[in-house]
């Protein structure tokens, strides 16, 4: 058996110096203890090294595994069939990867490609990075095209195109085109187009287009579209904003045109500026500065500065009006109020129907407090307090209650039932009971006793008298 001499390494040794090598187990020279050979130190180093110089200047590549470092100062340290084509590019491992961008990096994976300077792909499959100083973390079939300083964290089939300083964190089939300084967190099929400083948190099939500083937090098939900025959809499904400075909190199938808010609910619509729908379903605002708090199928049509609190199928058709609630109430007059009830109709300006059912007023500055089928027609300053089927057709008149009364004289009043008036300045009563009247002998005694002209007193014989 051959033994090696224990000696220190001589100084000044170079790769061209010859050395004596004994390979134990090699009996080709007839010696059972091994064979001896002469070689330079460089020849021995090349024989045992895993790496070799690539075709690029000062480049390095792993030997014998179809790796190519073509760029100057490039490195391919492992994997199979990888190519570093540009200067200072690096591929650590994987298979079929190509680093053709200056100072670009591929960590591993399969069939990944970097094209622009400073681009990075950490791993994954079939990813393409064509953005300067951009990053793809992994996943498969994620593409960055002409999007500088941007990132795709992972997921699959995500696309960043012409969107500088933007991020898609992950998810599937998310797309950002012309969306500088924007963000998609994840989800599926979300899209941002021609909108800067915008945000989609997640969800599915959400879209932002042509509107800057827009936000969709999540949900399904929500859409922000139109020119402008500062619109937000927090969640829900099939919600749409078509203008700027607007908000939808959630719900489904809600629509905001511009500068308005829908908090939630379903199938609610605002077609104007500065309006609000709190919730409910099927509510619609057509004119500006109006509010519907909730309910169903309530509508403000040609009505600015109007309010519907709730109820169902209530409608306001003129400005500065309010319906508190109820069902099928309609206000046509400016500055009018319906508190609630059923099928009340108000055509007069600055008039009020507090409640009841089927009450109507076409008079201005008039009031129907309640009851049923009561009507104030084409007059002003009149009042029906309640009752059933009462009608006023004159000014400055009133019906306290009762039923089937008809008042057609000015400054007249009805207290009772089935009364028809026939003169002005008169109060009409079916029956009148007066109790605890003072008793006096005559008119002089009544005046002396403190009564005033027009007061009523009783004589000792039971007669009623009026002081004169």
Please give the residue ranges for each predicted region.
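Acidic glycine-/aspartate-rich tracts in secreted/extracellular proteins
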Residues: 23-28, 189, 419, 461-462
